[in-house]
């Protein structure tokens, strides 16, 4: 995309419902919604089977049941959704620090200066979606474009579990055919008002002028005019830099010796280096090893460190494993802690 920005919009597919279907296989092939089932309750979301009956988010549960009598409604598990969202955010951070979360299930990523995947935003989006599926057994859709507006529109083009790329040379053609219904900020009433004046697609707006649009939609006219030309100059609103980096693996079978744990750490260390690459300007201040035992209790041993040292992880493992009390190990993890701001004079050192 040359000097253009490379923005990815990731949108999880029916996030809450997908988690319920993942955790409870009996829900996988039935119409499912998450929300309350009382007479005044509304739905948070629904799966694609339910959507075929017209069931939608924010719909009263009683209406949803009328549309789909065999709809299964389950109460949400917000703690699980938040933890899963945190895991997804960790996957994003492997590729860029420039992340703007919009909700638990969607975010913008700026990968303009990313070096992974040869700097290809398309490949990065594919890798992120693959990581989410392989590690969390959930699917996500993605839009890749030169700005936030187009990336968000694009992420909806090939849902579910797909992605759409709008390169700079395709922007004009893509936007020209775009229905005004798809522009954020245009609800049914505004669209109806525009429609009455002959505006149906962005092409219609492009042939008009801001003054004429102001007479119809007021202050929104300028934004509408720019978006109809594919222009959106907003930067990502990055809330804060990550304070740590972690990688862990839940083992297929519990292991029962320190040497077996060391082999796992050797493997995790190489993956940690890969994930560390996008954060090479951050100053490391801490290393840690985490073990979770057969009984699901866990322990973490940390120490101060200004570089990522494999030998130090092995030393920390020895201390952590001494707390096992003959319990098997089911999870092994490595952590790095960062200083609050990037070190200006100190370059990150990687001891291989």
From Swiss-Prot:
UniProt keyword list: Cytoplasm, DNA damage, DNA repair, DNA replication, DNA-binding, DNA-directed DNA polymerase, Magnesium, Metal-binding, Mutator protein, Nucleotidyltransferase, Transferase
PROSITE patterns: UMUC
Single GO biological process annotation from the record: error-prone translesion synthesis
Assigned protein family: Belongs to the DNA polymerase type-Y family.
InterPro entries linked to this entry: DNA/RNA_pol_sf (IPR043502), DNA_pol_Y-fam_lit_finger_sf (IPR036775), DNA_pol_Y-fam_little_finger (IPR017961), DNA_polymerase-Y (IPR050116), DNApol_IV (IPR022880), IMS_HHH_1 (IPR053848), Rev_trsase/Diguanyl_cyclase (IPR043128), UmuC (IPR001126)
EC class: transferase
Active site (record annotation): 106
Residues in UmuC domain copies: 7-187
Subunit annotation: Monomer.
Cofactors demanded by this protein: Mg(2+)
Record organism: Colwellia psychrerythraea (strain 34H / ATCC BAA-681)
Protein name: DNA polymerase IV
Cofactor: binding details: Binds 2 magnesium ions per subunit.
Pfam families linked: IMS, IMS_C, IMS_HHH_1
């Amino acid at each position: 995309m040359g000097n253009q920005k490379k923005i990815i919009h990731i949108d999880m597919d029916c996030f809450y419902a997908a988690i319920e279907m993942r955790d409870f296989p009996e829900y996988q092939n039935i119409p499912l919604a998450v929300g309350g089932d009382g007479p005044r309750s509304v739905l948070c979301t629904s799966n694609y089977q339910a959507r075929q009956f017209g069931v939608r988010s924010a719909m009263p549960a009683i209406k949803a049941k009328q549309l789909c009598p065999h709809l299964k409604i389950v109460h949400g598990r917000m703690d699980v959704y938040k933890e899963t969202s945190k895991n997804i955010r960790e996957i994003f951070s492997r590729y860029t620090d420039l992340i703007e979360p919009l909700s638990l299930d969607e975010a913008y990523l700026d990968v303009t200066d990313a070096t992974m995947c040869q700097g290809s935003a398309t490949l990065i989006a594919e890798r992120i979606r693959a990581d989410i599926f392989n590690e969390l057994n959930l699917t996500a859709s993605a839009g890749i474009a030169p700005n936030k507006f187009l990336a968000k529109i694009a992420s909806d083009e090939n849902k579910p579990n797909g992605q759409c790329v709008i390169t700079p040379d395709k922007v004009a053609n893509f936007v020209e055919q775009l229905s005004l219904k798809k522009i954020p900020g245009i609800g049914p009433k505004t669209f109806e008002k525009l429609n009455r004046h002959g505006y149906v697609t962005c092409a219609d707006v492009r042939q008009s002028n801001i003054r004429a649009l102001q007479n119809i939609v007021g202050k929104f006219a300028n934004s509408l005019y720019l978006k109809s030309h594919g222009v959106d100059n907003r930067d990502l609103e990055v809330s804060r830099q990550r304070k740590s980096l972690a990688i862990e693996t839940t083992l297929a079978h519990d292991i029962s010796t320190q040497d077996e744990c060391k082999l796992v750490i050797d493997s995790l260390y190489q993956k940690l280096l890969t994930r560390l690459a996008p954060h090479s300007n951050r100053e490391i201040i801490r290393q840690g090893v985490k073990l979770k035992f057969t009984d699901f209790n866990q322990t973490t041993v940390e120490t101060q460190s200004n570089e990522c040292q494999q030998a130090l992880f092995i030393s920390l493992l020895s201390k952590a494993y001494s707390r096992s009390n003959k319990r098997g190990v089911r999870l092994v993890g490595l952590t790095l802690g960062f200083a609050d701001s990037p070190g200006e004079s100190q370059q990150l050192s990687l001891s291989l």
